[in-house]
Design a protein with these regions (language model features):
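Short hydrophobic/aromatic-rich motifs at helix boundaries and adjacent loops
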Residues: 1, 24-28, 91-93
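Thiamine diphosphate
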Residues: 5-9, 32-127
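Acidic-glycine-rich active-site phosphate/pyrophosphate-binding loop
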Residues: 17-36
């Protein structure tokens, strides 16, 4: 597994002009290194909603690419968004989920299925 900060650095290096919607653990790192903070939309107060917000931006701004930087606990709070995203099929949307097995922001409690859940599999089966 790639450490979250290393993955964030790689994304920042490869970023062109994408709008970045970040939440929870990945956003904590993203805010430290983003080269284009004017195109960043941090959503700390909306745990579980970054995917929905990112989808809305992608649909409203089809010429702009939108990246969502999400946490595993956050996406588990809104798994239904994966079905909605799959249904809309936005070509300008990319969802990155960082898996650390805990609700970091609320004190590090383990997430349900933290060691066994297959988030990539859930996303693929969602469409």
């Amino acid at each position: 597994m790639i450490p979250a900060f290393e993955a964030i650095k790689a994304l920042n290096t490869n970023r062109k002009n994408e709008i970045v919607v970040g939440t929870m653990t990945p956003n904590r790192y993203w805010e430290l290194i983003s080269d284009n903070p004017g195109k960043d939309l941090p959503v700390f107060g909306a745990m579980g909603k970054a995917s929905s917000l990112g989808l809305g931006l992608a649909l409203a701004k089809p010429k702009d690419k939108v990246w969502v930087l999400d946490g595993d606990g956050s996406i588990l709070m809104n798994l239904g968004s994966l079905i909605t995203i799959a249904d809309q099929k936005p070509e300008n949307f990319c969802h990155f989920v960082f898996q650390d097995g805990v609700y970091f922001t609320t004190g590090g409690q383990p997430i349900p299925g933290g060691e066994t859940v297959d988030l990539a599999g859930i996303a693929l089966k969602s469409g």
